[in-house]
C-alpha cells in the first residue's frame, strides 16, 4: 500500500500541474492502449474452437475493416492462405464469417430463409437510396448524337454511365421517362451510388457529405417520377405508350391495396439503379480492356462484318445472339470484374458448417465472395489475365441437371456449385441477368462498329479498382483515346 500511495501521490502531483488538454490526451491514449491490450488478450487467450478462426486485429470495432475495404480480394486471398476457406473478421464492430469456394457460395447464397437474412444487412444501405417500402425495405444511340471529331480522348466511366442510364431508362421505363433524363441524371445516380459506402452499414443517418448528396439525389429522382405519375393520373386512363410506370399504376397488392404513387417512384429508382449500376461498371471495364487490347476490338468488328454483313444492319435481339465473341468478352469481363465483391447475410439461427466443427452463431454475419472462385487458379488458368478466348473451350459454369428453384420469378438453377457467379445465386440472385447481357451486348457492339479504342501514350496498365462503395468500379482517371471508323465499302 505504501508503494501504491507514493505512485498515486506522484500521479496526482503531475496531473495538478498539467493542462486540461494534456490530461484529455493522456486519458484518451490510455483508454486506447488498454482497449488494444484487452482486445489482443481476448484473441490469444479466449479462443472459441467451435467458431471459425478470427482474423487477428489490433483495434476493437475497427477490426479488419481498413484492409478489407482497401482491396477485398487481396484480403480474402491472404486470409484464405492463412486460415482456409472459413474465417471470421471484424467489420465495423460486427463479426462477419467468410466462407469461400463453391461450398461457401452454396452454404450462404442458398441458405434457408429462417437461417439467413439479406434485408437486415442491406436495408440501412438501400432504403435511403431507393426510398421506403421497396426492395430491402419491405416483408445507345444518344451517345452518337453528341457529335465529336473523328478522334479524341474521353472519360470512360463518365461517358459509359450516361450511355447505360439512357439505355436502361428507355428500355426499362419507356419513352417519357427517357425524355426527362439528361447527363445530370448520371451524376445523380453517382450520388446515389455513394450511398452504398461501407460505413453506412452502421451509420446510414450520419450527416456526412456523401449522405447529404445521396439524400438530395433521392429526393430529386423521386420528384421526377412523381411528376410523371401525377400528370398521367390527371390525364386519366389514356395511354400514349406502354411502360413499367403505367403497369405499376394499375397494380394492386394481394389484399387489393393499390400500389402507392410514392412506392412506384421508389421502385423506379431501384429498377433503374439495377439496370444502370452494375452495367455501367462492367461496360466501362469492357471499353478499358478493348483499349488495352486493340486486336480483340478488331476481332469483334470483323465478327459483325462476317455475321451481320457489311451494311451493318441495326442491332436486334436476334442479331446479338449470333455474336459469340461479343458474349465471351462480356463473360470474361464479368469474371474478373464482378460488380459486387461481397454478398452478406445476417445469421438468424445457429448454422453448423458441414464437415467442420464450426457453428456460426447468430451474433455473426456471413459473407460470400463468388469473385474469389472466379479469380482462382484451380478454376481458371492465369485467372487475373483478361482472355476472352478462354471461353472458346467449354468451361463448366453450370449443370443442366442441377436442382431448380422458383423464388417467385420463375424457375432458376440454384447455381452455387459453379465457380462463375457474376449475378449471385439463391433467392436473391439478380433477376436482371438476361437484361444485363442484352444491354452490355448492345453497348459493346454499337461502340465497336463505330470506334477504335487505344490507351493514352505511356499508359500500359488498366486503372485499379475502386472499392469505396459496395459496388466496385474503375478507380480514378479512366481516359482513353477513340477514333471513328471509316464507313465500310462493299467489296
UniProtKB/Swiss-Prot annotation:
<protein>
    <recommendedName>
        <fullName>Sterol 14-alpha demethylase</fullName>
        <ecNumber>1.14.14.154</ecNumber>
    </recommendedName>
</protein>
<dbReference type="InterPro" id="IPR017972">
    <property type="entry name" value="Cyt_P450_CS"/>
</dbReference>
<keyword id="KW-0812">Transmembrane</keyword>
<dbReference type="GO" id="GO:0008398">
    <property type="term" value="F:sterol 14-demethylase activity"/>
</dbReference>
<comment type="function">
    <text>As a target of azole drugs, plays a crucial role in azole susceptibility.</text>
</comment>
<keyword id="KW-0808">Transferase</keyword>
<keyword id="KW-0408">Iron</keyword>
<feature type="binding site" description="axial binding residue">
    <location>
        <position position="430"/>
    </location>
    <ligand>
        <name>heme</name>
    </ligand>
</feature>
<dbReference type="InterPro" id="IPR001128">
    <property type="entry name" value="Cyt_P450"/>
</dbReference>
<comment type="similarity">
    <text>Belongs to the cytochrome P450 family.</text>
</comment>
<keyword id="KW-0472">Membrane</keyword>
<keyword id="KW-0489">Methyltransferase</keyword>
<keyword id="KW-0503">Monooxygenase</keyword>
<keyword id="KW-0560">Oxidoreductase</keyword>
<dbReference type="GO" id="GO:0020037">
    <property type="term" value="F:heme binding"/>
</dbReference>
<dbReference type="InterPro" id="IPR002403">
    <property type="entry name" value="Cyt_P450_E_grp-IV"/>
</dbReference>
<keyword id="KW-0256">Endoplasmic reticulum</keyword>
<dbReference type="InterPro" id="IPR036396">
    <property type="entry name" value="Cyt_P450_sf"/>
</dbReference>
<dbReference type="GO" id="GO:0032259">
    <property type="term" value="P:methylation"/>
</dbReference>
<comment type="pathway">
    <text>Steroid biosynthesis; sterol biosynthesis.</text>
</comment>
<dbReference type="GO" id="GO:0016126">
    <property type="term" value="P:sterol biosynthetic process"/>
</dbReference>
<feature type="transmembrane region" description="Helical">
    <location>
        <begin position="20"/>
        <end position="40"/>
    </location>
</feature>
<dbReference type="InterPro" id="IPR050529">
    <property type="entry name" value="CYP450_sterol_14alpha_dmase"/>
</dbReference>
<keyword id="KW-0479">Metal-binding</keyword>
<comment type="function">
    <text>Sterol 14alpha-demethylase, encoded by cyp51A, cyp51B and cyp51C, that plays a critical role in the third module of ergosterol biosynthesis pathway, being ergosterol the major sterol component in fungal membranes that participates in a variety of functions. The third module or late pathway involves the ergosterol synthesis itself through consecutive reactions that mainly occur in the endoplasmic reticulum (ER) membrane. In filamentous fungi, during the initial step of this module, lanosterol (lanosta-8,24-dien-3beta-ol) can be metabolized to eburicol.</text>
</comment>
<keyword id="KW-1133">Transmembrane helix</keyword>
<dbReference type="GO" id="GO:0005789">
    <property type="term" value="C:endoplasmic reticulum membrane"/>
</dbReference>
<keyword id="KW-0349">Heme</keyword>
<dbReference type="GO" id="GO:0008168">
    <property type="term" value="F:methyltransferase activity"/>
</dbReference>
<dbReference type="GO" id="GO:0005506">
    <property type="term" value="F:iron ion binding"/>
</dbReference>
<dbReference type="Pfam" id="PF00067">
    <property type="entry name" value="p450"/>
</dbReference>
